[in-house]
UniProtKB/Swiss-Prot annotation:
Signal sequence bounds: none
GO MF annotation: an example: DNA binding
Protein name: B3 domain-containing protein At4g05630
Gene: ARF46
DNA-binding region per Swiss-Prot/TrEMBL record: 32-124
Location relative to the cell: Nucleus
Keyword annotations: DNA-binding, Nucleus, Transcription, Transcription regulation
Any one annotated GO CC term: nucleus
Amino acid sequence: MANFPDKQYDSNNPYNIMITLSPFDVDRSTTIMMPKALLETNLFPFMEISTLVQLLQVQDKPKMIGVYDIDTQITTYVIIRQDGNNFKFHGWNDILKRKHYKAGDTIAFWWDLRHTRLNFKHVA
C-alpha cells in the first residue's frame, strides 16, 4: 500500500470549511455543528457516494469519519449526523480535551481525498 503525504492546509483552497467556534462549541460540548449548506458545497462533492447516501438518506444510521489534526497528527473518530439544517459531529469533546480552544477561535477543515478523512487546523 502506498504511503501518501497528508494534505496540508492551504489558505487559498476555496473548499476550506471555516468554523468560528461559539461558546457552545467549547464549553463542555460533545458536538460541533456545521451548516448543511456549507458541507453540501465544500465537503460532500469529495466524499464517497456510499458515505453520502448513508448520511443523507439513512438518517437513523449515522456515519463515523476520521477527523485529523494536521498539527499533532492525531486522528479522532467522530459520528456525523444530520440535525435539521446542520450536521453535528459527535465526539468533538475528545478533540477539546487536547486542544483547549476558546470561543472565537477559527478552525479550518478540509477533506483529504487520499486518506478519506476530514483534516483540521487552528488558523485564528
